[in-house]
């Protein structure tokens, strides 16, 4: 039988879940759902004002009562209905007879009413308070107290609010049948914008009303535009609510009279059923009361079944939700780069504009400070914000990477901007590295990096002497002016006169007395050592293709050392003059222990204007320099004529990249024509006739210029055009 029932069920299609649900609906159940939209941003992810849901802020919140029936043992309380009074027993130790304050904020169910009851009042001066803590700031719309069934109504009470978690209190609303006598306020007070933030008083003696309600915005002029009214925003804000009951309404005197008449008693249930008594005695009791609310035996008390506070979690328009953290504290889930329990401030490093409440017109999102990635902290400056016409007010703090300024956009003192790097680069600022002796300070130009140089000093870091100055041993004046006879020897080019150029050509290399300021050949001077020197030839004419063509070689070489053993060099030069086939390596064997000393100097010098037409007379003293040829732009080919007047008889075909020996007459060095410095590169143009084979020499046709990068392209251009040389 059971088997038949199972077959019947399986054969019935309406019980098959797969067949009851269509394929589309079935697969949609497991498809990935799009995340819900954030109420604080629109579809374009632009910020907009958002608010949390409207809630009963009092639900399940803690309430502290100053008086609770039965807290000090079993007590009697009485209820009044029509002309009958019924009395009961309360006891906090008995759950069925206890009326704790937590009943005020539990789930309100009309079918199962729970109440808080105070201890029976003993006179009109008793004040009973209820204090409700909301946990954080809320923007409230109403406060409602629901009375327990058959409970006497309060005649006078005050609702207070606190915005600092109970540290201070201010009146929120007064209730009384005698507003002016008790609180000094009229029962019907007109409200304008000047007093819309003040508490008012209203009458609570309306019959057949089981609750007391207070609306925070009712009758206040700015309530329709709360966003633009900071006064009302503060008015509706509260962290705690306190209700103070001052006195009860007087019950029916006939019901109070029954207290003396006695009646049936149900001790088991704690309920007293007292019949109504009529007679003149009732009037006597009322007269004895003298207007007081209660007597010690009346059993009158305050009884509230529900304490409701409607409002929204205060997030200032920057959050759509409040949640409880691990410590149980209620906080806003802030958006718009805001922070705080109420989103009342901008989060760190977002102070480029002042914090403001979000409105329907403007979200007032907090903006990140612009520190170009060089700072992690900033602050807001209102004066700067005003000067920028409301664009930016953030001031960066503790700028890193040697930067400074409001936006860390400048290099601090002692550093300058590296233009090759973006402003956000961590190495955008380079140290000035000003020379401690050559500079007059450690602070360079923040843009160019130029250090302030002392007189006669030049260079980006003030590390060399300027033209016309020579180095001294003084730290105060490291570069001093050279004598006039030495200044005339300076020029940016080392240009010798061409033999075939007219001597009267103005500005040419052969013009010895022309407008170009050439020194006369016959003018001489003596050095401190007594040597007679002719002035170095100076020319303002640029190096050109004609001069390139008239030289046998053109090289770029670096001076790497100097040999001071001039006598051995002179003997070797004489021997090579007599036997040009001697190998180069023998020169090194002649000087196995030669010493090299650095040559100091600052300027570019030219070859001397030799009075003797024989540039290197045999037997004259020579100085030897070690060169490292770095580039060869021109050299003589085998069999090519080395020009007229070649005293050595053959072209120099050994020029190539690598080491080479450069010989210069001692006289020319002492006369500083040219002035050679170790570890400097030079452009050298000359003729093979000015030195024996295997050497480079200096003669009247030599050109020696300190190397500059611009020369490379010019030499290459001359190389290509050399075929046009005559």
Curated annotation (Swiss-Prot):
Residues 533-725 form the NTR domain. InterPro entries: Laminin/Netrin_ECM, Laminin_N, LE_dom, LMN_ATRN_NET-like_EGF, Netrin_domain, Netrin_module_non-TIMP, TIMP-like_OB-fold. Residues 490-516 are annotated as: Disordered. Keywords: Developmental protein, Differentiation, Disulfide bond, Extracellular matrix, Glycoprotein, Laminin EGF-like domain, Neurogenesis, Repeat, Secreted, Signal. GO terms for cellular component: axonal growth cone; basement membrane; cytosol; extracellular matrix; extracellular region. PROSITE patterns: EGF_1, EGF_LAM_1, EGF_LAM_2, LAMININ_NTER, NTR. Residues 1-29 form the signal peptide. Disulfide bonds join 313-322, 315-332, 334-343, 346-366, 369-378, 371-396, 399-408, 411-429, 432-444, 434-451, 453-462, 465-479, 533-671, 549-725. Glycans are attached at residues 108, 112, 127, 445, 652, 679. Netrins control guidance of CNS commissural axons at the midline and peripheral motor axons to their target muscles. This is Netrin-A. It comes from Drosophila melanogaster. The gene is NetA.
């Amino acid at each position: 039988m059971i088997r038949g029932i199972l077959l019947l069920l399986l054969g019935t299609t309406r019980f098959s879940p797969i067949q009851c649900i269509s394929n589309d609906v079935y697969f949609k159940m497991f498809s990935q759902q799009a995340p819900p939209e954030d109420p604080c941003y629109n579809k374009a992810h632009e910020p907009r004002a958002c608010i949390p849901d409207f809630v009963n802020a009092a639900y399940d919140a803690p309430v502290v009562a100053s008086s609770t029936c039965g807290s000090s043992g079993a007590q009697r309380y009485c209820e009044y209905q029509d002309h009958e009074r019924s009395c009961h027993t309360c006891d906090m130790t008995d759950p069925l007879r206890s009326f704790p304050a937590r009943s005020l904020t539990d789930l309100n169910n009309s079918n199962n009413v729970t109440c808080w009851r105070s201890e029976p009042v003993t006179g009109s001066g008793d004040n009973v308070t209820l204090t409700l803590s909301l946990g954080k700031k809320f923007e409230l719309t109403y406060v409602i107290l629901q009375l327990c069934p058959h409970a006497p109504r309060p005649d006078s009470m005050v609702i207070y609010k606190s915005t600092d978690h109970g540290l201070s209190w201010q009146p929120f609303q007064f209730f009384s049948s005698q507003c002016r006598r008790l609180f000094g306020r009229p029962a019907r007070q007109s409200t304008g914008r000047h007093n819309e933030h003040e508490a008012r008083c209203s009458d609570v003696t309306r019959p057949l009303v089981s609750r007391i309600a207070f609306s925070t915005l009712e009758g206040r002029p700015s309530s329709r535009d709360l966003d633009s009214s900071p006064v009302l925003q503060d008015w509706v804000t509260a962290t705690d609510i306190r209700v103070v009951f001052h006195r009860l309404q007087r019950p029916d005197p006939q019901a109070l009279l029954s207290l003396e008449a006695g009646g049936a008693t149900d001790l088991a249930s704690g309920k007293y059923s007292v019949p109504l008594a009529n007679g003149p005695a009732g009037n006597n009791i009322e007269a004895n009361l003298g207007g007081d609310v209660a007597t010690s035996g009346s059993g009158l008390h305050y009884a509230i079944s529900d304490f409701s506070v409607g409002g929204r979690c205060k997030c200032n328009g920057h959050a759509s939700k409040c949640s409880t953290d691990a410590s149980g504290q209620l906080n806003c889930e802030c958006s718009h780069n805001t922070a705080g329990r109420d989103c009342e401030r901008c989060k760190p490093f977002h102070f480029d504009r002042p914090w403001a409440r979000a409105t329907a017109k403007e979200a007032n999102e907090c903006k990140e400070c612009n520190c170009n990635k060089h700072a992690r902290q900033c602050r807001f400056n209102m004066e700067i914000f005003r000067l920028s016409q409301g664009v930016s007010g953030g001031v960066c703090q503790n700028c890193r990477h040697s930067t400074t300024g409001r936006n860390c956009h400048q290099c601090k003192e002692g550093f300058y901007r590296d233009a090759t790097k973006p402003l956000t680069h961590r190495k955008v600022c380079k140290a000035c590295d000003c020379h401690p002796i050559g500079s007059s300070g450690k602070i360079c130009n923040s843009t160019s990096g130029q250090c302030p140089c002392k007189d006669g000093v030049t260079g980006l870091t003030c590390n060399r002497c300027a033209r016309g100055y020579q180095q001294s041993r003084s730290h105060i004046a490291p570069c001093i002016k050279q004598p006039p006879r030495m200044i005339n020897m300076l020029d940016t080019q080392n240009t010798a006169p061409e033999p075939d150029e007219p001597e009267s050509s103005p500005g040419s290399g052969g013009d010895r007395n022309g407008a170009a300021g050439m020194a006369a050949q016959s003018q001489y001077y003596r050095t401190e050592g007594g040597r007679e020197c002719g002035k170095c030839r100076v020319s303002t004419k640029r190096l050109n293709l004609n001069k390139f063509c008239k030289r046998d070689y053109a090289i770029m070489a670096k001076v790497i050392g100097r040999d001071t053993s001039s006598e051995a060099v002179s003997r070797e030069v004489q021997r090579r003059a007599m036997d040009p086939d001697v190998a180069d390596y023998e020169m090194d064997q002649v000087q196995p222990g030669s010493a090299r000393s650095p040559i100091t100097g600052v300027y570019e010098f030219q070859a001397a204007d030799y009075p003797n037409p024989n540039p290197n007379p045999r037997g004259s003293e020579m100085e030897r320099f070690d060169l490292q040829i770095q580039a060869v732009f021109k050299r003589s080919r085998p069999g090519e004529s080395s020009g007229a007047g070649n005293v050595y008889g053959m072209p120099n075909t050994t020029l190539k990249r690598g080491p080479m020996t450069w010989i210069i007459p001692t006289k020319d060095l002492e006369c500083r024509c040219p002035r050679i410095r170790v570890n400097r590169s030079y452009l050298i143009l000359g003729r093979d006739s000015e030195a024996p084979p295997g050497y480079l020499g200096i003669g009247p046709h030599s050109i020696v210029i300190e190397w500059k990068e611009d020369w490379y392209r010019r030499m290459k251009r001359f190389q290509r055009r050399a075929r046009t040389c005559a």
